[in-house]
C-alpha cells in the first residue's frame, strides 16, 4: 500500500527521476519559461522552489548545496546573483504553471512553467519528453 507516500513516480526509476528534475530545474533557471507535461510541471515545483528559497541568502554553504542539487555552475550563478535578489521579498510561490492544451502525439496534458515576475520576451524551450 502506498499510504502517505508523496510524489509521483512518472514511470521512471528514482535515479532517472532525480536526473530529469535536475535537468528541468537547470533549464527553468536558464530560460525562465519551459513547456512540459502537467504532472512533471507539478513535481518540478517541489524541486525548483526550495532552490530559489535557498538562493535568497547568499553564502558559500548555500551555493554548495545548490550546486549539489543542480550540478551546473551557470544555474547556481544565476540563482544567487539574479533570482535570489529578485525574490528576496516574496515568501514563496516563485513558479506559475499554466495549462496549454494537449500534445498532438499522445494527447498528454501540457503546461508552461514560468518564473513569476520574469522579464517578458523570449522563446519557449521544450523540456524533457
From Swiss-Prot:
Assigned keywords, A-Z: Ribonucleoprotein, Ribosomal protein
Keyword Manganese: no
Assembly description: Part of the 50S ribosomal subunit. Contacts protein L32.
One CC-aspect GO term: cytosolic large ribosomal subunit
Protein name: Large ribosomal subunit protein bL17
GO molecular function term, any single one: structural constituent of ribosome
Xref: Gene3D superfamilies: Ribosomal protein L17
Organism of derivation: Pseudomonas aeruginosa (strain ATCC 15692 / DSM 22644 / CIP 104116 / JCM 14847 / LMG 12228 / 1C / PRS 101 / PAO1)
Family as reported in the entry's similarity comment: Belongs to the bacterial ribosomal protein bL17 family.
Residues in the signal sequence: none
SUPFAM superfamilies documented for this protein: Prokaryotic ribosomal protein L17
Top-rank taxon, per record: Bacteria
Gene name tied to this protein: rplQ
InterPro entries xrefs: Ribosomal_bL17, Ribosomal_bL17_CS, Ribosomal_bL17_sf
Pfam family, one: Ribosomal_L17
HAMAP family cross-referenced by the UniProt entry: Ribosomal_bL17
Gene Ontology biological-process entries: translation
Amino acid at each position: 500500500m502506498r499510504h502517505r507516500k508523496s510524489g509521483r513516480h512518472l514511470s521512471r526509476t528514482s535515479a532517472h527521476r532525480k536526473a530529469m528534475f535536475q535537468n528541468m530545474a537547470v533549464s527553468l533557471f536558464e530560460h525562465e519559461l519551459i513547456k512540459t507535461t502537467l504532472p512533471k510541471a507539478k513535481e518540478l515545483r517541489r524541486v525548483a522552489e526550495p532552490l530559489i528559497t535557498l538562493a535568497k541568502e547568499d553564502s558559500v554553504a548555500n551555493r554548495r548545496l545548490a550546486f549539489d542539487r543542480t550540478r551546473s555552475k551557470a544555474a547556481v550563478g544565476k540563482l544567487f546573483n539574479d533570482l535570489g535578489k529578485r525574490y528576496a521579498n516574496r515568501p514563496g510561490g516563485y513558479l506559475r504553471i499554466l495549462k496549454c492544451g494537449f500534445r498532438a502525439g499522445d494527447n498528454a496534458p501540457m503546461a508552461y512553467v514560468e518564473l513569476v515576475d520574469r522579464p517578458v520576451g523570449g522563446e519557449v524551450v521544450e523540456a524533457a519528453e
